[in-house]
């Protein structure tokens, strides 16, 4: 029954104390690893707070559900102050300023937040590889829960390539294909880094990426891939956006005057430097694939060789669209390479139109995803249905009495001034003013296209019609104008003023009034 002594019990007291204390520092060192991000939203929040030196608020943001950086950027003033109060930052305005500055940098230049998270332990959930545009919301990416077989490999391969990725994203590699060329798109990962990432980088095409060879000016070896490569990579616009740009360029180019050979020669003579750089393009054949590549290289508006752009700053969607539009214009008219002011104006016009059409289509697709028809179609169908129901009332035994009045003004007018004929018609048509429940227009159609305004109008019409029915029924029972119903003394004077009838009724009334006056005078005497 005696248990064997443990190995730690046989050790000296000093050594045993050391062994008992060693797990405590390890536990403290691994405690921050529990707060490392596990999803894309948490990773974006981690990097923004790390940029602002506010990582102490990270767990508070996660506990409050603030793992959406885009929500912080799009929040209004009151909503943003409420969020700051929830995370305990409202009483520290300097922290709020730093966070706002980091959010502005994240919105304008998400490439600065692409550095990997340091010290990722092997036992934690592996972080998937995200692109340089992790700050954008577009793109379907996994939530980081990989298969059990690749967890250890992904976590191990993340730390060794961190310095390489950081240097590669911030500055071009000295020995790479784009050495010395600041126009090479920053952050293009090497094949080795792609293999270590688990092949999850092709999840979606980010919106903030250079166009198909138009946003980036590559060298001769890289330009062929950018111009003729298949599929959309991280340095391209979306195919749908490119299609909108091409359609807008073709529409504008129909009414655009093209330059002639004499204009080309005169412009090249005036600018010798420009002639040395783009003069060979005008000598190339139109069917030469190299010509399109050269046009895309020298038609770039943003991100040129001679531009003073901050290193590592990515092009925005508007800039990429302008570059693509400029390339499309120059491929249709090569003389625009020499008229860059005019080219820039045309490209900006195309970018505005394409961005508007893209946002309009996105809103329509969003409404279709919610399950409802487009708003314009809904209004048209509701208007047509209400017009048809008003013009074509449902048939019945007495079709001249509609089931409901089409307007509120007619009901109020008919109730305000009624003649004798109106009373008689109301009394005679009382059964027809209450159609059977099947004919009531209160039942919604099967397709559910009734608008709220039409439903309220119908309910008001029904209420007015019921009130009119009650008032007419009461007047019919009390009116002396209707035969077989003797008048009552309490309603005589009011009703005789509204519907005077021929006969002895006025004389009787006057006689009764004179007799009442005589009796009153006799009682006074």
UniProtKB/Swiss-Prot annotation:
Compositionally biased tracts (Basic and acidic residues): 510-525
Places the protein is found: Nucleus
Cross-link (Glycyl lysine isopeptide (Lys-Gly) (interchain with G-Cter in SUMO1)): 379, 517
Example of a GO MF term: transcription coregulator activity
Domain of life: Eukaryota
Principal location class: nucleus
Region annotated Disordered, chain positions: 1-31, 135-238, 381-416, 501-525
Region (NCD2): 267-356
PTM (free text): Sumoylation by EGR2 represses EGR2 transcriptional activity in hindbrain.
Span list, region NCD1: 35-113
Known tissue expression: Highly expressed in brain and thymus, and at lower levels in spleen, kidney, heart and testis. Isoform 1 is predominantly expressed in testis, whereas isoform 3 is more abundant in thymus.
Record keywords: Isopeptide bond, Nucleus, Phosphoprotein, Repressor, Transcription, Transcription regulation, Ubl conjugation
InterPro entries: NAB_co-repressor_dom, NAB_fam, Nab_N, NCD2_sf, SAM/pointed_sf
Necessary for nuclear localization: annotated span: 353-384
Induction info: By serum stimulation.
Assembly information from the UniProt record: Homomultimers may associate with EGR1 bound to DNA.
Family: Belongs to the NAB family.
Protein name according to UniProt: NGFI-A-binding protein 2
Source organism (scientific name): Mus musculus
Origin organism lineage: Eukaryota, Metazoa, Chordata, Craniata, Vertebrata
């Amino acid at each position: 029954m005696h248990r064997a002594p443990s190995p730690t019990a046989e050790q000296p007291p000093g050594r045993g104390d050391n062994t008992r204390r060693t797990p405590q520092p390890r536990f403290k060192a691994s405690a921050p690893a529990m707060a490392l991000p596990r999803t894309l939203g948490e990773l974006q929040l981690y990097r923004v707070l790390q940029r602002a030196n506010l990582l102490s608020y990270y767990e508070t943001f996660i506990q409050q559900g603030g793992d959406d950086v885009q929500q912080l950027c799009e929040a209004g003033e009151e909503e943003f102050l409420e969020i700051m109060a929830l995370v305990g930052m409202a009483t520290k305005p300097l922290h709020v300023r730093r966070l706002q500055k980091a959010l502005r940098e994240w919105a304008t230049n998400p490439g600065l937040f692409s550095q990997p998270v340091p010290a990722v332990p092997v036992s934690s959930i592996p972080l998937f590889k995200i692109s340089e545009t992790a700050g954008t919301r577009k793109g379907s990416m996994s939530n980081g829960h990989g298969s059990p077989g690749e967890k250890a490999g992904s976590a191990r391969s993340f730390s060794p390539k961190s310095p390489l990725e950081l240097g590669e994203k911030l500055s071009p590699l000295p020995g790479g294909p784009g050495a010395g060329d600041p126009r090479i798109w920053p952050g293009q990962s090497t094949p080795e880094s792609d293999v270590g990432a688990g092949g999850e980088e092709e999840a979606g095409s980010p919106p903030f990426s250079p166009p198909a060879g138009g946003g980036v000016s590559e060298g001769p070896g890289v330009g062929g891939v950018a111009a003729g490569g298949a599929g959309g990579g991280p340095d391209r616009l979306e195919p749908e956006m490119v299609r909108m740009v091409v359609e807008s360029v073709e529409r504008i180019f129909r009414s655009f005057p093209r330059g002639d050979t004499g204009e080309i020669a005169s412009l090249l003579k005036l600018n010798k430097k420009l002639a040395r750089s783009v003069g060979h393009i005008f000598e190339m054949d139109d069917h030469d694939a190299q010509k399109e590549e050269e046009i895309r290289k020298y038609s770039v508006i943003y991100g040129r060789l001679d531009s003073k752009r901050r290193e590592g700053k990515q092009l925005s969607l508007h800039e990429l669209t302008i570059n693509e539009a400029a390339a499309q214009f120059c491929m249709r008219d090569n003389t625009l390479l020499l008229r860059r002011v005019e080219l820039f104006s045309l490209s900006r016009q195309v970018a505005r139109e394409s961005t508007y059409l893209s946002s309009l289509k996105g809103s329509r697709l969003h409404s279709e995803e919610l399950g409802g028809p487009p708003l314009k179609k809904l209004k048209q169908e509701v208007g047509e249905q209400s017009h048809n129901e008003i013009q074509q009332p449902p048939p019945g035994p007495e079709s001249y009495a509609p089931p409901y009045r089409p307007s509120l003004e007619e009901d109020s007018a008919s109730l305000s001034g009624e003649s004798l004929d109106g009373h008689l018609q109301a009394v005679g048509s009382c059964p027809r003013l209450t159609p059977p429940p099947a004919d009531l227009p209160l039942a919604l159609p099967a397709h559910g296209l009734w608008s709220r305004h039409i439903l309220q109008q119908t309910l008001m019409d029904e209420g007015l019609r019921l009130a009119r029915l009650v008032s007419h029924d009461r007047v019919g029972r009390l009116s002396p104008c209707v035969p077989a119903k003797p008048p009552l003394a309490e309603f005589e004077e009011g009703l005789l003023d509204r519907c005077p009838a021929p006969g002895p009724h006025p004389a009787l009334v006057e006689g009764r009034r004179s007799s009442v006056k005589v009796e009153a005078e006799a009682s006074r005497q």
